[in-house]
Amino acid sequence: MVASGGMATAGGAPGNGGAIAKAGASGTGGAINSSGGASPDGSIATGGVAAAGAGGSSSGDGATGGLRTGGATGSGGSTAIDVPIAKGGTSGTGGGGGSPNGGATSIACPAGAATGTPTTVSIDGANIKAANINGLTFKGFGVLSANGTSALLMDYKSQHPDKYAELLNVLFGGSHPLMTQVKIEMGNDRNNSTGPDPATMRLSTEVANVKRAPGFQLAADAKTFNPSLKVSILRWNAPGWVKTNDDVYTWYKNTILAAYRSYGYMIDFVNPGVNESAPDLTWTTQYAARIKADAAGFNSTTEQALYNGIKVVISDEVGIGSFGATMISDSTLRSSVSVAGYHYNTDDDSAGDFTKLAEQFDKEIWNSEAQATFSNTAFRPISGSGIGGTNSPLEMGNTIIKGFVNSHRTHFIYQPAIGSFYEGGQYSSKELLSARDPWSGWIHYDAGLVILRHFAWFATAGWENQANTLGVWRVVAQSSYTGATGTNPVSGRNGTPSYMTLAAPDKRNFSTIFMNDSATAQTYKLQATNMAYTGKPPLELWETRAAESGKAFNSNYMQYLCDVSADASGTYIVSVKPWSVLTATTLVNVGIAEYNTPLPIEGGRTVLDTDATGANQSTSDKVLYADDFEYSGTTVPVFGVGGRITGSEDFLTSRGGLQGAIPRYTCDRNGGFEVYLPSGSTNHVLRQQVDQSAMGLGGTWNSGNPITGVGDRRWLNYKASVDVSFENNSTQSGNNYAAIGARQQGGANSHTTSGTPYLLRLLFDGTWALLVDGASVAGGNVVSGTGGATIAGFKATYDTWHNLGLAVVDSKVTAYLDGTALTTYTDASPRLSGRVDLASGYYYTRFDNLKVETVDGSAPYYSEFLDDQETTDLASPPVTKLVYGGTWSHANGQDMYDYQRTLSKSSTAGASLKYTFTGTGLDILGPNDGSAKLEVTVDGQVTNASASTLASKEGYQTFTLRGLSNASHTVQVKVLGGTLVVDGVATVAAPIQ
């Protein structure tokens, strides 16, 4: 077992690929407290509940620790330059983190001389705008749940509540929560980028159901960790019945009240407009007036008062907001709108209107959809820029700084902050936290979260109250600057200064965050005047950067370095290393356990291989996965105050109820697939819930018919089957169909059936087709016998159940209907791994008894899957994994369909890649043109002097090696000619006997 934050014990070191052994699961089995340990009662300790509205400490100075008023702690008043790490190794558990001296006491920075010309940062208490309670208050960061990005999150809650609680605690818990808002982009069951979110009302007559939309439940659970959390909603596309603004108001109101009545919280902010569209300012003012005056349909005066107090946000446009000038000139609009938010771009309009709105009119300005990190930062240093570079955590940090400096953004919401959908979906690897394997409990916490801690942990973030008594810190414009170029992305590789200062409104404390996303060290002179403290308090220095070679990847994350003292003139000298972030603060945090506890380290990614129930991992039978959609007796935990588990709730009730509940492990890419209990029946089915003849269709980002995926991307050879039936008694000219697919990995066409390599489609009249990449390669009708297959007595009625099956073994694909083989297809360019898909037209369609089984004599799955940049694992000390020789480029920020957005590309002949593993084969995956010729060496012997490669798409195989004994092997491939692109390396498990 891998302890949270710890190194691996027997069974293998933790790594991104992960072994299949179930003992490789991360976690201690209990819930995680704020110090990283398991609480004996299974509860989550969060360090106390934040004061209402504050999102953090409510003390006057907002400090977690006390204020220092004297000189330096330790030996004298020396200044800090190029501060070394103290000897004695890292503290905390396993993989590092925490301060090098254990975090117990302060140490003085060693004396040093400044190098180069320092940049002066003046912090004048007169510039801390305590009277500005909205525009300059630092509100921290937010989670956007939208577009199917939370599709698997409730499975973590049901299957691994300890890991779900850990996730909530990391994001929303502690004395200084990172995330202060959950923003929910309401769905309409159609693809809005990654996938759809379920509509809360599919018909105007339907009672709003928020339990089937995971964002609402996420917000409810997050509030048990931070009751001050804000929640907002907006839409991109609406259900088919929503045609007018009155319909919008009805949909929103019913949904808002459903959330309040189901979970006990009122929505705080609403954007009445359309996501990433120009605002309708007339409707905005009308909506604001309606919501304030509405007195109908409430269950209590409290409910009405809370509803009437909802605030309005506009406009969530992509790029600079178009409405700044109107907000300045139109007092009616200005009084109607509390928040101006727009996406990604860090800049203001040409007149500086958003800066004026914040400073002169005290309006909140948000980056209401911001870019997080692209990649797994643990493996990023191979590219040569540490934790910085293209789409890195440091780049994200500079985006925060530039967003405030240029347009006074004081809140940043990440889309998505949580990536809880299968890899290969649109906008994959764009998140701060990845939770894609609910059966294993695997979660990757990226170093981007540590960057956010450098801001949120050294201030009191949140929303100030009207009485201005909560002590929320202000951002100090005159003490913040960046020379980083660009708007999205932002680049600080030019080595120019970049910093942001946060300060307590009572002027007793401040923190300055320095971001250095460059190869050049930077030196700063801090000078503080007109502050409310006495003397010249030392500044604690906290740093994050990549590890030195041979050290645990996170050994330099959130490290307390030392206390720097002011010189006789009151000046502090601070040096910021290349590719690092450093926070200098008057707060005393060094002795606080929370600050010396690293993020949890991901454990092994156990392959999905269950018993016949689908609920329990088991490698002792022929079943890889099964689901009859009953879930009888299954419950999920209920979280109470402080994240404590206070009870349980029926599985289906918690996820939407009998007429539409979130199934286990499915990830929709179009349409709405839910567990459904037909009237008069006791048999639950999986039903595609969007029927265009009954409800029409709303708008969409990526058009396509309903399709959902389930399973593990590492599955290789298997037979998948499912029962299907229809509710519409017309074939609808071939559009009313049911289908099963195999070996789906995602990609640009994944929102349609053409993105599934192999798919069997059936009409109820017996017409079938085997599709490869969306094109028919075989077909016929089992009633007439066309196509070569006849099934005697086949019942060609719409409501009869039939069984669809696909067997995929190496390059062969065999289609089955009711157990009869229809055809076998051999693919010259086989796709060898991937999940199972279920698909239909936009008509009510039923599925049941899904089963995925192993195939005798064939390997069922990869035993390990590594990112191309995974040259070491995550243990302490790290163990060597992939070994590159010769000349390669290792690039980050690649295509969204590349695994973790990284690629390694050979530059010249002679480039080599070597890996030692246990298994029967090795594959290289990634987008290739098939030009590479490889010399293959196994255990020191050349086994193929000139192996060919295949042209391949993202997620699929360009080179395969099979037939090895199930033992330890060292395989090397050397490029003889052409170009080899490596996205992933996978090892093959033993065949099923």
Question: What is each residue range found by the language model?
Answer:
Residues 1-115:
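Ser/Thr-rich, Pro/Gly/Ala-heavy low-complexity intrinsically disordered linkers and tails
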Residues 113-272, 281-289:
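N-terminal catalytic cores of secreted or lumenal carbohydrate-active enzymes
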Residues 367-484:
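Aromatic/acidic polysaccharide-binding cleft in carbohydrate-active enzymes
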Residues 471-537, 579, 911-913, 920-922, ...:
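Carbohydrate-binding surface patches
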Residues 505, 579, 816, 841-993:
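Glycan-recognition surfaces in beta-rich domains, encompassing non-catalytic CBMs
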Residues 514-637, 965-970:
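C-terminal beta-sandwich/jelly-roll accessory domains of carbohydrate-active enzymes
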Residues 635-694, 875-898:
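Extracellular glycan-recognition surfaces and repeat-rich motifs
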Residues 688-771:
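Secretory/extracellular carbohydrate-interaction modules
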